[in-house]
Amino acid sequence: MGIQTSPVLLASLGVGLVTLLGLAVGSYLVRRSRRPQVTLLDPNEKYLLRLLDKTTVSHNTKRFRFALPTAHHTLGLPVGKHIYLSTRIDGSLVIRPYTPVTSDEDQGYVDLVIKVYLKGVHPKFPEGGKMSQYLDSLKVGDVVEFRGPSGLLTYTGKGHFNIQPNKKSPPEPRVAKKLGMIAGGTGITPMLQLIRAILKVPEDPTQCFLLFANQTEKDIILREDLEELQARYPNRFKLWFTLDHPPKDWAYSKGFVTADMIREHLPAPGDDVLVLLCGPPPMVQLACHPNLDKLGYSQKMRFTY
């Protein structure tokens, strides 16, 4: 004699299954809605972002905060990449690269720390910086064109890099246990992006060594951020400064980047070493590369932003 199933029991089971299915679908949709959306979907497209805030960082540097499309958007910038800002000034197209000081953990906004080069201040650049002065003139609510991600280097974690020799070449994998960095002025922003990405992962064994060059002590941007990271991760991050015009009680190096500075504060040449460079072209070409040559760092051990 077969087992007869009660219609009431079947109905109850059906309702239960529908309820469970509904809960599963609802949970999936909630998780999906909470997943951050990416702003930079196409590196060839321009995205208009609105200025939210502008604050003074130092005597010649400001932090610009731009709103992303929604509070749940991230910029969508891989570590190692940068963005371009573009605008027309006096009828001419002006494009400049920048690396945000925020990351894709920050939702709803992106921050840029930029030195404002004013007209008539520097004798070599009497007109000042076109883009930086334009940004400084913006009012809250004004929009700027963003484009990206751009760049030849990507950090994928735990010492692994993908580096393109040029824009048309495929990326080549590179592994570094020790990361040397030489930055000048606002060239610190891509370094800080990378340092933060490495240090926030306890399992990342990469050691970071930064030599940061500036003209005067008041020109050192993001110093508090760097010194906080050094204090928090003393075994993973080493920080050293050099100034062209240091104060009397200066505890770090003086003058342009030299071979001795590199030897003392960056990892020695080796297959597990990568040295990153970002700063004014004269510093990179006339001070950094010749001294790296002198100390035996091969071209494969270097990358210039």
Curated annotation (Swiss-Prot):
<comment type="similarity">
    <text>Belongs to the flavoprotein pyridine nucleotide cytochrome reductase family.</text>
</comment>
<dbReference type="GO" id="GO:0015701">
    <property type="term" value="P:bicarbonate transport"/>
</dbReference>
<dbReference type="InterPro" id="IPR001433">
    <property type="entry name" value="OxRdtase_FAD/NAD-bd"/>
</dbReference>
<protein>
    <recommendedName>
        <fullName>NADH-cytochrome b5 reductase 1</fullName>
        <ecNumber>1.6.2.2</ecNumber>
    </recommendedName>
</protein>
<keyword id="KW-0520">NAD</keyword>
<dbReference type="InterPro" id="IPR039261">
    <property type="entry name" value="FNR_nucleotide-bd"/>
</dbReference>
<dbReference type="InterPro" id="IPR008333">
    <property type="entry name" value="Cbr1-like_FAD-bd_dom"/>
</dbReference>
<dbReference type="GO" id="GO:0004128">
    <property type="term" value="F:cytochrome-b5 reductase activity, acting on NAD(P)H"/>
</dbReference>
<dbReference type="GO" id="GO:0071949">
    <property type="term" value="F:FAD binding"/>
</dbReference>
<keyword id="KW-0274">FAD</keyword>
<dbReference type="InterPro" id="IPR001709">
    <property type="entry name" value="Flavoprot_Pyr_Nucl_cyt_Rdtase"/>
</dbReference>
<feature type="transmembrane region" description="Helical">
    <location>
        <begin position="8"/>
        <end position="28"/>
    </location>
</feature>
<dbReference type="GO" id="GO:0070062">
    <property type="term" value="C:extracellular exosome"/>
</dbReference>
<keyword id="KW-0560">Oxidoreductase</keyword>
<dbReference type="GO" id="GO:0016126">
    <property type="term" value="P:sterol biosynthetic process"/>
</dbReference>
<keyword id="KW-0472">Membrane</keyword>
<comment type="function">
    <text>NADH-cytochrome b5 reductases are involved in desaturation and elongation of fatty acids, cholesterol biosynthesis, drug metabolism, and, in erythrocyte, methemoglobin reduction.</text>
</comment>
<keyword id="KW-0756">Sterol biosynthesis</keyword>
<keyword id="KW-1133">Transmembrane helix</keyword>
<keyword id="KW-0752">Steroid biosynthesis</keyword>
<dbReference type="GO" id="GO:0005886">
    <property type="term" value="C:plasma membrane"/>
</dbReference>
<dbReference type="GO" id="GO:0005739">
    <property type="term" value="C:mitochondrion"/>
</dbReference>
<keyword id="KW-0753">Steroid metabolism</keyword>
<keyword id="KW-0444">Lipid biosynthesis</keyword>
<feature type="domain" description="FAD-binding FR-type">
    <location>
        <begin position="44"/>
        <end position="156"/>
    </location>
</feature>
<dbReference type="GO" id="GO:0005789">
    <property type="term" value="C:endoplasmic reticulum membrane"/>
</dbReference>
<feature type="binding site">
    <location>
        <begin position="136"/>
        <end position="166"/>
    </location>
    <ligand>
        <name>FAD</name>
    </ligand>
</feature>
<dbReference type="Pfam" id="PF00175">
    <property type="entry name" value="NAD_binding_1"/>
</dbReference>
<dbReference type="InterPro" id="IPR017938">
    <property type="entry name" value="Riboflavin_synthase-like_b-brl"/>
</dbReference>
<keyword id="KW-0812">Transmembrane</keyword>
<keyword id="KW-1207">Sterol metabolism</keyword>
<keyword id="KW-0443">Lipid metabolism</keyword>
<dbReference type="GO" id="GO:0005829">
    <property type="term" value="C:cytosol"/>
</dbReference>
<dbReference type="InterPro" id="IPR001834">
    <property type="entry name" value="CBR-like"/>
</dbReference>
<dbReference type="GO" id="GO:0016020">
    <property type="term" value="C:membrane"/>
</dbReference>
<keyword id="KW-0285">Flavoprotein</keyword>
<feature type="binding site">
    <location>
        <begin position="175"/>
        <end position="210"/>
    </location>
    <ligand>
        <name>FAD</name>
    </ligand>
</feature>
<dbReference type="GO" id="GO:0031092">
    <property type="term" value="C:platelet alpha granule membrane"/>
</dbReference>
<dbReference type="Pfam" id="PF00970">
    <property type="entry name" value="FAD_binding_6"/>
</dbReference>
<dbReference type="InterPro" id="IPR017927">
    <property type="entry name" value="FAD-bd_FR_type"/>
</dbReference>
